[in-house]
Amino acid sequence: MEQSSEVGSNLGSWDHKRDGSVRSGIKLSRAITISANFTQNLSTTRNSTGLEQMSMTRDYVAYGELLNEGLPFPGWSFRLTGLEKWPIIKRFAKSASMEHSFSGKETRSWQFEDGSPEQMNFFSFGTFASEYKDNERSSRINQNFSPLIGLNLTLKKNISLTFRNNMSKSLDETPTGLTIQNDNSYTSTGTYTHRGGMNIPVPFYGTLNLNNTISFTLNFDLNESREERSGDKINLEVGSFSESWKTGLRMSYQFSTKVSGGVRYEYRESDTRTTGKKVDRDFGFDVNLAISG
């Protein structure tokens, strides 16, 4: 009997992953807290035909119009409390704090037809990426400020205010070109709450005590998004863009533990490259009754 030449040729697949991370945090004072985190992941997969795929993800800080410069660097977060003690803020705020956070990632993948000539390691990745650029199949670099700046204020007379500005930028690159995405958003919320009550005389019952809570919430959101593309990886052209903003007011009330409701109104505007300008308005109300038997 003739033996097939394919017998025993399927060697299966091989998968290897290496992960490393470092975390640190420090409290400089009762009001200042800083934390940092760095993570790097390496992955290698080889199938039975000898095709090898490698990928790497690590924390990264990029700069330049095309995010083509940068260095491995940990993400960080920063929080500052006690701003209500500052000379101007203490005049109107009962409590105040500020936040800031950054995270950036670099992700790359390669493909080798007959196996890679060498293995990546944590300390010489830059040399590996430069030497085998022709084998690179995709890369992504993104940086995210979430928030770039965030403020939390509690004012007198039960008024609270929040503000957030988030920014992100990403670069996706393939052998055929690259895409850059820019996003920017502003979010603010103001809330006023009043708690009170009333006494209503009821015949043959006595006095009926009604405790009520009324709150007013005002929101404002602004979002901007812009995509740029380049086939030659040098000259950029706008691919798509969108801008939108909305504001809304909601009044909520609670007359007792069994009766609550609210009224809301929202106005929205948006403008995109494909659909143009659009305006929406929304009005509604709700009533909630708790019935128990």
Pin down the residues of each PLM region.
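Exposed, low-structure sequence patches enriched in small/polar residues
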Residues: 1-293
